[in-house]
Curated annotation (Swiss-Prot):
It comes from Clostridioides difficile (strain 630) (Peptoclostridium difficile). This is Acetate kinase. NCBIfam families: ackA. Pathway: Metabolic intermediate biosynthesis; acetyl-CoA biosynthesis; acetyl-CoA from acetate: step 1/2. The active site is at D149 (proton donor/acceptor). Mg(2+). Can also accept Mn(2+). The lineage of its organism: Bacteria, Bacillati, Bacillota, Clostridia, Peptostreptococcales. Homodimer.
Length: 398
């Protein structure tokens, strides 16, 4: 069975075609600047070094997906001879609120439910829905599945997801912790159990998805019991441009002092904060590490604050689960930041985390980075959200 995995952003689209007989990626691609001048598709077929590139106007996601399907079935660069070889489409959907705790086959009722969640993810859900509609128009007979970033976290107990706010704000507007990166946390926790040869039901795992956006999850027996992101992807860790946890009273203070309105605050917290705002240098951790090595004190303090926040969450989740067996690092910083992983592991030996410095000297490769006698196993696992989406799609349409 061949499954097309789509991840639609507001002006971009990532895709992979995966042969589920052997979980082999047949082709991958990216469309950028949808609805903007300079639209471009970049497509790669497995086993080829050259790329197939198309630069032409794409007014909307329907135009973009039509070009994607042409590329997938291209006579030279395609991975199938004709579109009807695509057996199913798996869509990444950012926010399902409380409506879906697992992936679902997309029906008109599911689409209506997703539209009701637009207020919870105004930047992401409209693009996800546009991708679904475009696919239905071009591939009307192909089954489609929605895989939700929030679904994995729906197993959290109320004690983890309720905020200290008036209860009617939860009942009226759904104000609660939802969590994000769920597909990634799900994949790496399952993969960690496989690598260690353990039953995931017997493991207490903390998964650290450390990218430009970053979140941590407590996974007890294969189920998420807590996560650092909240009502939106802004809560939790210090991120590339997002502030993470701050005192909420800072916001009305800044509204008065800086004359900011709600949109101004939103921009400040989401686009101008995090390590970018703290250093004034970049949202790229490599740039900040270089500056820190060259004696930049703000860069040094920023990295220390970032590491300390990750350590706090690991410790808190170990306490919440009454134990800790595994810590997993994934995503851009987690997979490639050797020094940051080492700093996070430092001062954590009291929890049973002992880093193997030689094993940690690796980037982007599945590796056990803890010592043989470490009570808590630490692993580097590159995330694979596309494969997880394809697996869920296969399970539901088979």
């Amino acid at each position: 069975m061949k499954i097309l995995v789509l991840n639609c952003g507001s002006s971009s689209l990532k895709y992979q075609l995966i042969d589920m007989n052997n979980e082999e990626v047949l082709c991958i691609g990216l469309v950028e600047r949808i609805g903007i001048e300079g639209s471009i598709l970049k497509h790669e077929k497995a086993g080829r070094d050259d790329k197939y590139v198309v630069e032409q106007p794409m007014k909307d996601h329907k135009d973009a997906i039509a070009l994607v399907l042409e590329a997938v079935a291209h006579p030279e660069f395609g991975a199938v001879k004709e579109m009807k070889e695509i057996d199913a489409v798996g869509h990444r959907v950012v926010h399902a609120g409380e409506k879906f705790a697992t992936s679902v086959v997309i029906t008109p009722e599911v689409e209506e439910a997703l539209k009701e969640c637009i207020d919870l993810a105004p930047l992401h859900n409209p693009a996800n829905i546009m991708g679904i509609d475009a696919c239905k128009a071009i591939l009307p007979d192909v089954p489609m599945v929605g895989v939700f970033d929030t679904a994995f976290h729906q197993t959290m107990p109320k004690s983890s997801y309720l905020y200290g706010l008036p209860h009617e704000l939860y009942t009226k507007y759904g104000v609660r912790r939802y969590g994000f990166h769920g597909t990634s946390h799900n994949y790496v926790s399952q993969r960690a159990a496989e690598i260690l040869g353990k039953d995931i039901k017997d493991l207490k795992i903390v998964t650290c998805h450390l990218g430009n956006g970053a979140s941590i999850a407590a996974v007890d027996g294969g189920k998420c019991v807590d996560t650092s992101m909240g009502f939106t992807p802004l809560e939790g860790l210090i991120m590339g441009t997002r502030c993470g946890d701050i005192d909420p009273a800072i916001l009305p203070f800044l509204m008065r002092k800086e004359g900011l309105d709600a949109d101004g605050l939103d921009k400040l917290m989401n686009k101008e904060s995090g390590v970018y705002g703290m250093t004034g240098i970049s949202s790229d951790f490599r740039d900040i590490e270089d500056a820190a090595k060259n004696g930049d004190e703000r860069a040094q303090a920023t990295l220390e604050a970032y590491v300390k926040k990750v350590q706090k969450y690991i410790g808190a989740y170990a306490a919440e689960m009454n134990g800790l067996d595994v810590v997993v690092f994934t995503a851009g910083v987690g997979e490639n930041g050797k020094a940051i992983r080492a700093d996070i592991a430092s001062n954590m030996e009291f929890l049973g985390m002992k880093l193997d410095k030689e094993a940690n000297d690796v980037r982007g490769k599945e590796t056990v980075i803890s010592t043989a006698d470490s009570k808590v196993k630490m692993l580097l696992i590159p995330t694979n959200e596309e494969l997880m989406i394809a697996r869920d799609t296969l399970r539901l349409v088979k």
